[in-house]
Amino acid sequence: MAALLLLLPLLLLLPLLLKLDVWPQLRWLPADLAFTVRALRCKRALRARALAAAAADPESSESGCSLAWRLAYLAREQPTHTFLIHGAQRFSYAEAERESNRIARAFLRARGWTGGRRGSGRGSTEEGARVAPPAGDAAARGTTAPPLAPGATVALLLPAGPDFLWIWFGLAKAGLRTAFVPTALRRGPLLHCLRSCGASALVLATEFLESLEPDLPALRAMGLHLWATGPETNVAGISNLLSEAADQVDEPVPGYLSAPQNIMDTCLYIFTSGTTGLPKAARISHLKVLQCQGFYHLCGVHQEDVIYLALPLYHMSGSLLGIVGCLGIGATVVLKPKFSASQFWDDCQKHRVTVFQYIGELCRYLVNQPPSKAECDHKVRLAVGSGLRPDTWERFLRRFGPLQILETYGMTEGNVATFNYTGRQGAVGRASWLYKHIFPFSLIRYDVMTGEPIRNAQGHCMTTSPGEPGLLVAPVSQQSPFLGYAGAPELAKDKLLKDVFWSGDVFFNTGDLLVCDEQGFLHFHDRTGDTIRWKGENVATTEVAEVLETLDFLQEVNIYGVTVPGHEGRAGMAALALRPPQALNLVQLYSHVSENLPPYARPRFLRLQESLATTETFKQQKVRMANEGFDPSVLSDPLYVLDQDIGAYLPLTPARYSALLSGDLRI
């Protein structure tokens, strides 16, 4: 009915709209309308769930925080339905509920809770009967850490697996915040993360104990409760969490223990990737966790689907979108601890996978694999994710289709998300007025030289025209908040823009440049810090990379800017990885960039590597590569320089490097 009410006035206005030449956008109206209706239904369903939990008995397991009541509900409604597949292990929703209940009770014991009834009204911090934890607990751990307070933060340093999920869910049920720590961090970065989120405890995988040994004195000095997850835990001051949980009953935990005072309260911390510095602990609210229950619903995924997830759980894409999104629809998730391109299609065939959650690099790894029989006999109908480049998109569909690719855009700490629900290749979303009515955002003009939005005489920002790159911003509101980061308030200063369209308004600054085309499709253009300026022109590193990646002998390309003495701006440099068994063809490469890129956008330097440096989530390391420069006496990789006079890429020898610095070699 809602769809008909929206469609009727548009039909009446159709003749006028055709005269105004808006048909390029109107042709996508059915898809826009269908997604809008789905989004409205999703919002209504999430609101109904939240209201039902709020009205439930505080003693019931179906009250409290959204993770607690959603899992309890699914355990009651579909107890035998498979929730998790991990290797040869299978866990039903009822088993997930019981395992997390044991973990919750182990943590509640560390809080001093003994299972009494609650004392007063909803939202109170009273917990019923609470006493100090048994005296032997702290002594056994060799720590003087006080009992965990309600709302204390417990950091997880765990690989993707069942233990990660049961501990995360158990912490939520126990009324404790969780901090997901990237598993590769050690020494200074690890201690920084623990301090920045105010962690009171750390749960670590036993397999990490050896590499963490140098950090243990500092961890003990911080007064942390220390737990490990395995029978091999025999290090002084570290207890075996799973052993403690095994001693607990698996009965449901009262919901009031996890009920937030406010839905905007911090539920957990997720650390940014740290590509430009130390990671920041993004605050994730209870509202955002609830909203993430709707992710797969918005993507058209259903309860009977089987979702393949091989992304790190310490990032939002794996935990909130993958796991919480799966809980939102009650589906099954196949959790792979580490992505393997050679095993992917065999896994999909074995587990009858229908949905695959990706980041762009995973799809590129798949298309670069040798053909296999399993890739022709699968049931995958939908791939959902972000960061898929157009050339890989086309190759992926041509080789593995028919299936749908649903590209999305979003940020861990952000308040805006986009969905390309039409399948248009290369687009990250739609900017239809229907979509922006539900998920408001704008593209504003941006000066890459000053690093600031362009403002008019009144001091307000201006929206971009079709085809013009613009900074993506979204209004901060009660429905779309920005909570910032744990620690000093100035960490979030650059993420907020004020007086954008009117005095007093506040918008979230994504730091990303997007382009909206004539048909209303959004295309990722560049990160504001990644756009380089050379010869007085702006160069989008992503566009240059996409051009080079069409060469059949290149498997991976990373474009970044380097400072050249005697020149303004930053010159483009391309780190290249070859596609085996191909060889680097400098003549073809120069011809290709000359034909497809303007002179100022052509890379001045090439660096040939066996594989390109990435973060744990496969994001390319641009800052590090830029800092390493192009000095052949420092770098062992083969280097090449563009000689403008000759019109060719030549080996960057020490002699040519000296000629470049003296100005004798023109680039």
From Swiss-Prot:
Catalytic activity, as annotated: a fatty acid(in) = a fatty acid(out); a long-chain fatty acid + ATP + CoA = a long-chain fatty acyl-CoA + AMP + diphosphate; (5Z,8Z,11Z,14Z)-eicosatetraenoate + ATP + CoA = (5Z,8Z,11Z,14Z)-eicosatetraenoyl-CoA + AMP + diphosphate; hexadecanoate + ATP + CoA = hexadecanoyl-CoA + AMP + diphosphate
Region Disordered: start-end pairs: 114-144
Residues holding ATP: 272-276, 315, 412, 512, 527, 619
Membrane-protein topology: Single-pass membrane protein
Compositional bias ranges of the Low complexity kind: 130-144
Tissue: Expressed at high levels in adrenal gland, testis and ovary. Expressed at lower levels in adult brain. Found in adrenal cortical cells, spermatocytes and interstitial cells of the testis, theca cells of the ovary, cerebral cortical neurons, and cerebellar Purkinje cells (at protein level).
Classification via Pfam families: AMP-binding, AMP-binding_C
One GO cellular component term noted in the UniProt record for this chain: mitochondrial membrane
UniProt keywords, alphabetically: ATP-binding, Fatty acid metabolism, Ligase, Lipid metabolism, Lipid transport, Membrane, Mitochondrion, Nucleotide-binding, Transmembrane, Transmembrane helix, Transport
Cellular location(s): Mitochondrion membrane
GO molecular-function term, one example from the UniProt record: ATP binding
Family per similarity comment: Belongs to the ATP-dependent AMP-binding enzyme family.
Protein's recorded name: Long-chain fatty acid transport protein 3
Gene giving rise to this polypeptide: Slc27a3
